[in-house]
């Protein structure tokens, strides 16, 4: 399976960088989210947050490999 826009991922342990307090309660380990953008070079994904308008890469909340696992392609 490979990740793409629309895939469902489950968040795991978050990396060493602190997450913005506005998003910390929403993006907790074990929660599932829909991928908006995926960078095949870095494995970076972007997710949306309620009230956050995401229309292009760079607008979303970023997570890196090891911080998420693919649930549904």
What are the residue ranges of the model-derived segments?
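Intrinsically disordered, low-complexity repeat segments enriched in small/polar residues
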Residues: 6-7, 11, 34-37, 65
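Short coil-to-beta transition motif at edge beta-strands of beta-rich domains
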Residues: 2-22
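Intrinsically disordered, low-complexity, charged/polar segments
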Residues: 46-73
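Short, exposed beta-strand/loop patches in secreted or surface proteins that constitute
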Residues: 1, 35-38, 61, 68-70
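Short beta-strand-centered aromatic/proline hotspots
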Residues: 21-38
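General beta-strand recognition
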Residues: 10, 44-46
């Amino acid at each position: 399976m490979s990740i793409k826009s629309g895939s469902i991922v489950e968040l795991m342990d978050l990396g060493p960088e602190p997450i913005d307090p506005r998003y910390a309660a929403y993006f907790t380990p074990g929660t599932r989210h829909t991928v908006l953008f995926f960078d095949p070079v870095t494995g970076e994904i972007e997710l949306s947050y309620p009230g956050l308008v995401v229309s292009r890469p760079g607008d979303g909340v970023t997570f890196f490999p090891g911080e998420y696992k693919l649930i549904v392609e």
